Amino acid sequence: MNGDWLIRGRDGRLSVYQLSGDAVLCRSERGRGGAWTAPRTVGGEQKLHPVLGIGQGIDGYAHLVSWRPMTNGESGLVHSAHFRPHLGALDWNPVGHPRGQGRRTGAPAVAVDAQGRAHVFVPGEDGTVSLLAQKEKGGWEPWRELKGSSVQDCLAAATGESGRVELYATVPDGILHWRQQEPGAQPVLQEALQTQVRPGTLYALATSADSTTVFYTDVSGDLCAWRPGDEPAVVVASAGPGPVSAVRCDIDGHDCTLLAQRSASGRVAFAAYPTELESAGAWWTESGPQLSLDATVSLTTDDNGRVVAATSSPSTGQLLLTARKDEPGLALEAWRQV
């Protein structure tokens, strides 16, 4: 999945999205901090390819995008919006194909601007990136192709604190960055970073009023952070081969960025450091049981600002949760299955 699959809704309840065969499932808290609902299918009976892009606006609404199989080996993109975790999401709505018609290409990435408009980014087979953006009063703008080439199937979209949408993508020799210059505008290709990135390791996070930070693992195995305009910094050696998740949170009165990753041992590893101060260093602490190889981790904060972490495995369907204890430091509650 591309994007945060553990989210806090507008009403403060937590919910998760999981891939399951040819469907997307959702589970949510029945009440804040309480029991969870059973899994339910998102968007009706539409069959999907096992890919999902997720974005959330400041209004708390979740936007989901996937590919659906069609006739003659072709596929099309579909979109659903989820307004309240305890209610059903809208049915999947076809939104087309970047080339009008054709086969499935890369996994979509989704970001939602300050006006609540979803922006869907899709990598193409020819190394381009296409954008589909919602209109403010309903409907969709035409597909647009962003500048840039040789893009690989690894996108990370984010919305800055300004409310403007940004996108990062890997290319064979680095990372490309696009940013909206004003709300509603097409993102513009900015500077590129020359580096070697492990596939599937990009994660973007808003870290200040003016900046987003993209995290990635380089080919030497270091987890790095880059803010356009600055030099990249090594945060810590990566704990494992997969993607990282990140969230900004308050730890003992300090604005910190918390990282989580499935470690090489199969457990979840956590590391924290002062936000945008990578030079302070970070170190991993492992937590919880050993997980299946396809398990991923996602982070968010609850209504009280408390960190919550979840792990999900498509092969087993297992969903585990933990939360930070109400005490100094980063001590976590025991992991529990829901």
Annotate each predicted stretch with a short phrase:
Residues M1-V338:
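A structural motif
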